[in-house]
Amino acid sequence: MMEQGVGANTVPGVTAPGNVYMIQARNPVAPGSKGQPVGMATYLTSRVTESDAGRANLQTPRVVIQNPAEVNATQGPPTALQHPTAVASLQTPPGEIQYSLGTTDLQTQPGGPQNPPTCAPGPMYTSNQFQWNMPFGSSFTFDPKKFIKDEVRTLGAIQILIGLTHIFTAINPSLYRQYSYSAISGYLVWGGIFFIISGSLSVEAEKDRSSCMVHGSVGMNVVSAIVSLAGVLLLLVDLIRNPVIDVKTVSGGLLPFVLLEFCLTCVVSHFGCQATCWNQFVNRTEVPTIVIANPANTPTGPFNATYSTTGHVNVITSSANPTSPTNAAAMVPPVPS
């Protein structure tokens, strides 16, 4: 049951359960002051919504409108809102104040007597928020270790041996008497020198891992690949066009080494180019993305508020200061009837 009384010196009583939360307005302003016109004192409204945790769904809210002892019936009626702690979320009709269990922050909007502060429903962001920084797109730098490994020294040593084989073969005078194309063109000499230089740079690059040394090794391997390709063509010409058995024997013995040199230089040049081209990602910027998560308790589902009157309680309200509106929540203990 509900009772309502209006008088100059009486405080009305409200029938409500024991768990009553009061939203009161403070800092009264006397009629006739600068903050309020003479003869017209408007108070911030506060609403009492009474609910019973034992009931499931009652759609019709019961609102008690009361006046303080100093205000007559023509002035603004203060109200208060009451809800039980057992209800997780209140789903009230449009215009009502909604609450979520575990949310303690109230968002108020500044205003005067005509625009009192109201509670804005929505997600409440508390101080205990977690933040994660998720960077997208990492900056890449040149890493010679991706190119220079233990195998590079072995490949360089093989290239040096192939170059020495070419030079030692060039000493044979019978190749020049039988008009060998590989010997007359000088491929056996300058080809062997290129192979020795590229192999030496590959071995040195394993010791000195500077970008300059790596670039030099890659460049010489590219040149050696071209030279070895030219040597393959010259040796094939000797095998096809020269009828002398000695020339065919020497050319056939060098051909596998030249093919091996071509394969080695192509492999080293390929991976070396990948290592040097890694520099194109150096100027790539890092873009972080901040993800903010609200760990506040959120309701698992909407519930309809229950409203009932089971006990007798006294409601005490005070007028509000329009210049600095504040809302305070107080719990009024039940008074036995």
Curated annotation (Swiss-Prot):
Residue ranges, annotated region (Disordered): 101-121
Chief location: membrane
Which UniProt keywords are given for this protein, alphabetically ordered? Answer: Membrane, Transmembrane, Transmembrane helix
Residues crossing the lipid bilayer are 155-175, 183-203, 220-240, 252-272
User: Which Pfam families does this UniProt record tie to the protein?
Assistant: CD20 (PF04103)
The topology of this chain with respect to the membrane is: Multi-pass membrane protein
**Which superkingdom heads the taxonomic lineage of this protein's source?**
Eukaryota
Q: Which family does it belong to?
A: Belongs to the MS4A family.
Q: What is this protein called?
A: Membrane-spanning 4-domains subfamily A member 18
Q: Which organism does this sequence originate in?
A: Bos taurus
What taxonomic lineage is listed for the species of origin? Eukaryota, Metazoa, Chordata, Craniata, Vertebrata
Q: Which gene encodes it?
A: MS4A18
